[in-house]
Amino acid sequence: MKKLILFALASLAIISCRKDDDESKPTIVGNWKISKSILKFGNGSSQTYTLDSCESQNNFTLQKDGKMSSVSYGIDFNGNCVSRTANGTFSYDEQNKRLVMYADEVTTVEVSSITKNELIVISIPSYDNDNDGKEDKLYIYFTK
């Protein structure tokens, strides 16, 4: 009887650990709101872009079923903050760290880092913004 109870407790502990491991793994699914953008130059320097109160509302939502929506904010010709919503689908290749969103247009980004509450992506393609012959990368930070 003691062996049976010990076996049951050990099995329960193993199952509990597996569940905890799955829950702690970061997921790309969720509502992501932009927090900042940093342009990292090929020469090692960087420039942080300050978002105005309108741009700081930009966000997108990725759902478990592969559907997505994004809301982009910008200033119109009259100085008003206006929004534009796009709906579509997405795919995420975890191994190659590629997120592709299919809405009004196709957007592909490289996932640099993902945690429970932060997503950092690199805009694709990269450009030589300062014309020094070195590739510069735009890092975009999002929070849940």
Label for each model-derived stretch:
Residues M1-L4, R18-K19:
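Positively charged n-region of N-terminal signal peptides that target proteins for export
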Residues I5-L9:
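Sec-dependent signal peptide hydrophobic core
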Residues I14-S16:
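C-terminal motif of bacterial Sec signal peptides marking the signal peptidase cleavage site
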Residues R18-T89, D93-K144:
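Lipid interaction determinants
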